[in-house]
């Protein structure tokens, strides 16, 4: 059984064969129209028009990249030519100096003579020597560096009001004003007869209580209240009656003989 792709291909071949039979040889010259444009072709076609702002920018960038590529190529070719010329000159100089004495390595220009004493101006331009005006720092002392102070801080430092506004301080507690001695008219509950007779009328008696010893059973009952509770657990009992006692004899029972009759 053919697959789906094979069946589709076979149907296309059959359709093309039928059209060839109908139209004959004119099929090859038939105008099928314009090919369907893919997104890439559409974008390139839009970039080729100068009416679009994006297309103009694209052309400018393309020209700039081409210019950079050509300039870079010229620079590389020029550098290669200079390198080849230098190599040829070196070979010529080497061939001329084969019989002569070898020269030492050439020193770059503006190099100070090592035999002369070093000049601070040559070593570090602008350096005139060690600072002699400032005394050396003493041992175990810290030099306070000068810090930058903005004009705003200088203006605030001269005005105490601005300084207090910038660095607020906590409010100090104000002194309490002395209260005036007012007479109180609040009513107080007074006992009958006045406060003088209240001590005689009101009497309090301490209640009597009895101290229990540790060995007292009442104290033990209070200490362990579960000890005096009634137990409802059932104890196992035998198959005996509670009212009638059962007498068990150990004497052996005698076999009662049955008298035989005369007929037997």
Swiss-Prot record:
Residues 106-120 have a biased composition (Pro residues). Residues 90-135 are annotated as: Disordered. The modification Phosphothreonine is found at residues 107, 111. Expressed specifically in heart and skeletal muscle. In skeletal muscle, localized to the soleus and plantaris muscles, which are predominantly composed of slow-twitch fibers. The keyword Lipid metabolism does not apply. The modification Phosphoserine is found at residues 101, 116. Transmembrane segments: none annotated. It comes from the Eukaryota. Its main location: cytoplasm. One of its GO terms (biological process) is negative regulation of transcription by RNA polymerase II. Keywords: Cytoplasm, Methylation, Phosphoprotein. GO terms for cellular component: actin cytoskeleton; Z disc. It is found in: Cytoplasm, Myofibril, Sarcomere, Z line. Interacts via its C-terminus with spectrin repeats 3 and 4 of ACTN2. Interacts with ACTN1, LDB3, MYOT and PPP3CA. Belongs to the myozenin family. This is Myozenin-2. It comes from Mus musculus. The lineage of its organism: Eukaryota, Metazoa, Chordata, Craniata, Vertebrata. The gene is Myoz2.
